[in-house]
Amino acid sequence: VSVRGGHLASNLGVVELTVALHRVFCFPEDKIVFDVGHQCYAHKLLSDRAERFSTLRSRGGISGFPKRSESPYDSYETGHAGTAISAALGIAKARDLKGEDFCVIALVGDGSFNNGLIYEALNSLKILKTRILIVLNDNGMSISPTVGGTHEVLSELKEGNGPLADVALFERYGLHYMGVYNGNDLSELLPAMEQAKSLLSTQSVLLHVTTRKGQGYVFCEQRPDRTHGVSPNRPGKEYSAALGEELTALAEKDPRIVAVTAAMTDSLGLRPFFNAFPERAFDVGICEEHACVLSAALATEGMHPYYAIYSTFLQRAYDEVIHDVCGQNLPATFCIDRAGITGADGETHQGVFDLSYLAPVPNLTIAIPSNISEFRAMLRLSASYPAPPAIRYPREGEEGEFLPVEIGKFAVLRSNTTDIIIYAAG
């Protein structure tokens, strides 16, 4: 990981849990779906890819996420949060219809339990009348620390203070709740996993385990937010740092400015803003659609929200972009990070679709800076813009030469007498 980059802390936290799953279940005959999928490294090492693990996240190498074409041990491809229970239900229902007999497991982090898709799937559990095992990997983190009411419920259960109503919440969905177990202790985990497997023959089970993100590596344990994703050293400056600096400076002068994010405060560079203006900073958890509607509603009351999000995750809120923000022509600014080709995380995290799906949206102005200086200027301009702007930018860039920003006009960098015109966006 130090050479190729990748997700470090989240994978260190599930080593024992993954070993237990492979010990108790028979993969690939049994099927496992990893929610998000970034915590699958130990699974890959224990299946058929140990010898190829040095090629992780490289061209021609193994993916940093589950990949069906890579191995029969990867039964479903993931990359975004909240999909695992829906996928597990689909696999289990197909199993039932074909008269087959194998176990289906969804490994889901507590951060994903903020996502609405999880509850849509749970609501279908009784309707579909099938059996799955949900392993709730509770480490109190997504990329940032988990937030909200669901986090409080899970915390009460971990501390042994949870009322019966908390357990009943899961059982109302048709799940037999088991917990809470130490997911980093095989002596405790293996018997619990065996019991869950035996119960699975007649009912669906939720096995609640706690793990420590970054387990076994002191620096990761102390700063799991900083080591969730690790990149090889790079020389470029990051746009996200400029976003945090510029928004904080703008907010000092304009009390209408608020920041909204979906569980990615640090990755998007918003920590300075959150520290300076906690009452105007909103991390809603992994709830991209909700964050978009929240931004729209804030704008209807005279606030100027900046919704910062990775390009790949904005796809999840497309209906809300069209209907709630742009349909009402509201001055909510989309700060779209990791736009364009993003490299080693694979196709699930490329930011290559946003320009195509945003271009037809009414009332939306799309801005693409050529350097960080221009990005700062676009942010300043957006603070007084009366309609929704979308500023899309890559991870890294150079501060560059400042060019005046005019809406609806290209900057002419070079002109000669030929009949050839080259347009460059960004």
Can you name each region flagged by the protein language model?
Residues V1-S47, E171-L175, V180-L190, A196, ...:
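N-terminal amphipathic, basic-rich helices that act as targeting or association modules
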Residues H7-L128, I257, T261-A262, L270-R271:
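Cofactor-binding active-site loop characterized by glycine-rich and histidine/acidic residues
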Residues D74-G236, S240-A241, E245, L364-G426:
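Glycine-rich ThDP/TPP pyrophosphate-binding loop and its adjacent helix/strand module
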Residues T348-V352:
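Flexible, small-/acidic-enriched active-site or ligand-binding loops
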